[in-house]
């Protein structure tokens, strides 16, 4: 694989007015990805062989803060600023319940988001615990519009898809 996915996101304009596409080559990326800009498009080369994987829970996080703000747990985290982002062609896997505490099924999000107009398609979204895909846009701002298609959602707990919105 190439350089870090996070480094590519950081090189994107702060407020892109059109989609900013980041192509991710096949390989295993053991890194947390934080999207804090709108219009970011992550495109994996091969859904089954472009894998972003970490092991974390709310209590045991790789990163607590990013750019001075608290960051939620999850392999990919979309902050409030990450509206209109697309994730496609990836396997996103939180394997905490396999490698750190076997059998533990507490919340182990693969993708967590607070952004609006999030599109996740043609991807595997896996977690060893509850809430593999959890998008929670701010309801008071009218947020919560999501589109999902052609997903393989897996979790060993409950709520493989835990949305708030429409």
Q: Where do the model's predicted regions map?
A:
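Acidic Gly/Asp/Thr-rich repetitive segments characteristic of extracellular carbohydrate-active
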Residues: 1-23
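General structural concept
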Residues: 20, 29-30
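Well-ordered beta-strand segments characteristic of repetitive beta-sheet solenoids
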Residues: 22, 41-45, 88-89, 123-125
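Short, small-residue-rich loop/turn micro-motifs
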Residues: 46, 56, 91
């Amino acid at each position: 694989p190439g350089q870090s996915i996070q480094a590519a996101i950081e090189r994107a304009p702060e407020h892109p007015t059109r989609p900013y596409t980041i192509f991710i080559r096949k390989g295993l990326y053991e890194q947390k990805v934080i999207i804090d800009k709108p219009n970011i498009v992550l495109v994996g080369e091969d859904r089954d062989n472009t894998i972003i994987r970490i092991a974390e829970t709310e209590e045991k996080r790789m990163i607590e803060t990013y750019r001075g703000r608290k960051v939620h747990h999850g392999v990919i985290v979309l902050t409030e600023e990450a509206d209109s982002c697309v994730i496609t062609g990836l396997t996103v896997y939180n394997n905490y319940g396999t490698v750190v505490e076997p059998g533990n099924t507490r919340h182990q999000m693969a993708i967590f988001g607070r952004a609006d107009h999030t599109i996740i398609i043609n991807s595997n979204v896996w977690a060893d615990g509850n809430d593999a895909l959890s998008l929670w846009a701010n309801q008071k701002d009218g947020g919560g519009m999501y589109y999902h298609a052609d997903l393989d959602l897996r979790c060993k707990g409950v709520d493989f898809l835990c949305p708030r919105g429409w």
